[in-house]
């Protein structure tokens, strides 16, 4: 099996890692370090020319192209929401697949081989719709998603808690850009068992950004009398500045927000936004958001039947956990200091890589990961009541069945409506789908015995079977969630993704050819205007200059136009320099000179004084000298 990578597909930032030399190593993004370190922004954009941009390049142009830029797509995973960009609609899975496609490409460049398999993490509180959408995104990106694991489980692996000698109970506080997960795990004898999980899929660092953005907008309005909230470009700049200030205030006590020319007044001209932010002001603004985390901590403890004092370790992951107020809050709620030593922005990806390494056989480990289902699974019964089959926080993989009957006389079919959630009425929970068991023999109500059985695999994906115990007739399905894509849809989206990949390849080829042409033009002009100025004829000079001009005119054109012009220029230069070389060479056999058989260089004709060879490569000085020891020709 080839390399299996671990991926943290985040709301605000994403990261990937792979096992190298027995250790998880973060895969660097092609664009290098970002504000988030080795992670990169989960931002997707389309330029005005339709070019796909992912990561830091997408984030950088968001100010000037906000309408075609998508942030926090993960918050829409599992829903039927669509993003409208340039008269085209994109599903959340497709936007996420662009991020995963970039990760795949970066990983292949890093490990030097094709990467086809991945372990992807999801928030522990993700329902089946969201998990299935994540798998679909991986498939569209050309990845075989061999395992979906919960982010807290991955983080615990990254912190090395599997190597602890004593049994322990770990609270993982996962506060990301868009979701909060609080998970309590028990570790002992190499077994990680999730005892409980709680959280909020709509609470995260982006909520902090929002209150900070609102504060900046309000302060500017008070000072300048201008409301920037409806100015898309201004708001994009402010959002970027707010996120930057939030990150900076994690390590310094104050920072300045400076946004010149943020607005224009016809009477007074351009207006600049200048504001000093302090950590205390940030704490004041985000305090209510941090307080909203407390119920999730309490619920996780309650479900695990534990008290604060039972917790041995606290693991913090996610960008917002770098904020001192967040660390202090969790520490005070539990009454224990938090663990350190692993970057909270990288922990999940590193843990996913460890799990990937176990699957690939790169890591020898006795670790067993036992996750739980985050929400209760059940079906809708008479009157719209939800009947639970698998309770929340049940260890998975698992299987459980229950026998039901018909609600009417002579009923020949039943509809099984599967729901996920904690509300007593089916309509108040998340609908995962429905299916029919048909051709039942007519019978009085209450007589047929229909067993409904739920199977949940290690990825949290649900399969349901309904069987008539009288006739043994059964229907088996994998839950087709409302957002699950058909094979045809996935194939089409894969083709779209490959199209963008092909466009990227063509773009690179175009840039490489342009760079080659510009370099050749520079060298040629140097030859004509300096090195060979007194050695070439006027006719030769005009011929070369005209050819250079023709290349310059098509520098920004497609390779089909540029390449023939460049080759024509190279041919003219080679022809002129070869003629000069022949004219300058003394007759064969002259004392100490290289004979005719020494004129051929390694890759083409060797030119005088730095001339180009046939393959376009430049020699250092181009002079040929005879070696006194072995008669070989070499370039000085």
UniProtKB/Swiss-Prot annotation:
GO molecular function per UniProt: ATP binding; ATP hydrolysis activity; ATP-dependent protein folding chaperone; heat shock protein binding; protein folding chaperone; unfolded protein binding
Q: In the UniProt record, does the keyword Nucleotide-binding occur?
A: yes
Q: Which NCBIfam families match?
A: PRK00290.1, prok_dnaK
> In what ranges is there compositional bias, type Low complexity?
590-623
Q: What is this protein called?
A: Chaperone protein DnaK
| UniProt cross-references to HAMAP family, sorted A to Z | DnaK (MF_00332)
Family, per entry = Belongs to the heat shock protein 70 family.
Task: List the coiled-coil residues.
Answer: none
Listed A to Z, the keywords are: ATP-binding, Chaperone, Nucleotide-binding
GO BP: any one term: chaperone cofactor-dependent protein refolding
- Role: Acts as a chaperone.
Return the Gene3D superfamilies for the record: 1.20.1270.10, 3.30.420.40, Actin, Chain A, domain 4, Substrate Binding Domain Of DNAk, Chain A, domain 1
Q: Does the keyword ATP-binding apply?
A: yes
Give the matching PROSITE patterns: HSP70_1 (PS00297), HSP70_2 (PS00329), HSP70_3 (PS01036)
Q: Region Disordered: start and end of each range?
A: 579-636
């Amino acid at each position: 099996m080839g390399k299996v990578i671990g991926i943290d597909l985040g709301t605000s930032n994403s990261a990937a890692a792979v096992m190298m030399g027995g250790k998880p190593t973060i895969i660097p993004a092609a664009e290098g370090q970002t504000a988030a370190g080795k992670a990169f922004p989960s931002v997707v954009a389309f330029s005005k020319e339709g070019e796909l941009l992912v990561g830091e390049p997408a984030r950088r142009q968001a100010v000037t192209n906000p309408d075609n830029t998508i942030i926090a797509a993960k918050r829409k995973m599992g829903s039927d929401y669509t993003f409208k960009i340039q008269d085209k609609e994109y599903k959340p899975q497709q936007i996420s697949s662009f991020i995963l496609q970039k990760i795949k490409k970066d990983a292949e460049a890093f490990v030097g081989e094709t990467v086809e398999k991945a372990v992807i993490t999801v928030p522990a509180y993700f329902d089946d719709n969201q998990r299935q959408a994540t798998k679909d995104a991986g498939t569209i990106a050309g990845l075989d998603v061999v395992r979906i694991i919960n982010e807290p489980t991955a983080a615990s692996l990254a912190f090395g808690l599997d190597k602890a000698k004593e049994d322990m109970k770990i609270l993982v506080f996962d506060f990301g850009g868009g979701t909060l997960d609080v998970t309590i795990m028990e570790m002992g004898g190499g077994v990680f068992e999730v005892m409980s999980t709680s959280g909020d899929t709509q609470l995260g660092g982006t909520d902090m950004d929002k209150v900070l953005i609102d504060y900046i907008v309000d302060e500017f309005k008070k000072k300048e009398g201008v409301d920037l909230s409806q100015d898309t470009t201004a708001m994009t700049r402010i959002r970027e500045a707010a996120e930057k200030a939030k990150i900076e205030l994690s390590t310094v006590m104050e920072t300045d927000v400076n946004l010149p020319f943020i607005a224009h007044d016809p009477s007074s001209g351009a207006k600049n936004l200048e504001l000093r932010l302090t950590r205390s002001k940030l704490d004041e603004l985000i305090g209510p958001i941090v307080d909203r985390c407390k119920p999730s901590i309490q619920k996780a403890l309650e479900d695990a039947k534990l008290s604060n004092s039972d917790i041995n370790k606290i693991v913090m992951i996610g960008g917002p956990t770098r904020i001192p107020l967040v660390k202090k809050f969790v520490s005070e709620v539990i009454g224990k200091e938090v663990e350190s030593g692993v970057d909270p922005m990288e922990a999940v990806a590193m843990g996913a890589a460890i799990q990937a390494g176990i699957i690939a056989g790169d890591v020898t480990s006795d670790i067993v990961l036992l996750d739980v289902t985050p929400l209760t699974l059940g079906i809708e019964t008479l009157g719209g009541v939800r009947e639970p089959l698998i309770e929340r926080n049940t260890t998975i993989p698992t299987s459980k069945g229950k026998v039901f009957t018909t609600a009417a006389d002579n009923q020949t079919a039943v509809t099984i409506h599967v729901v996920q959630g904690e509300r007593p009425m089916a309509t108040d929970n998340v609908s995962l789908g429905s299916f029919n068991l048909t051709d039942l023999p007519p019978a009085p109500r209450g007589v047929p015995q229909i067993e409904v059985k739920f199977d949940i695999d290690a990825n949290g994906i649900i399969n349901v079977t309904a069987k008539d115990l009288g006739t043994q007739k059964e229907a088996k399905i994998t839950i087709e969630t409302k957002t699950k894509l058909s094979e045809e849809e996935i194939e089409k989206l894969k083709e779209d993704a490959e199209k963008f990949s092909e466009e990227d390849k063509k773009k690179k080829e175009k840039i490489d050819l342009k760079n080659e042409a510009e370099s050749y033009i520079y060298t040629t002009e140097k030859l004509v205007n300096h090195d060979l100025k007194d050695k070439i004829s006027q006719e030769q000079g005009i011929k070369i200059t005209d050819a250079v001009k023709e290349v310059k005119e098509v520098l920004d054109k497609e390779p089909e136009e540029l390449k023939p012009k460049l080759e024509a220029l190279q041919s003219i230069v080679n022809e002129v320099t070869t003629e000069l070389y022949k004219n300058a060479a003394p007759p064969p056999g002259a004392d100490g000179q290289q004979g005719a058989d020494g004129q051929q260089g390694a890759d083409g004709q060797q030119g005088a004084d730095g001339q180009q060879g046939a393959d376009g490569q430049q020699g250092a000085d181009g002079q040929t000298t005879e070696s006194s020891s072995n008669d070989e020709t070499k370039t000085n």
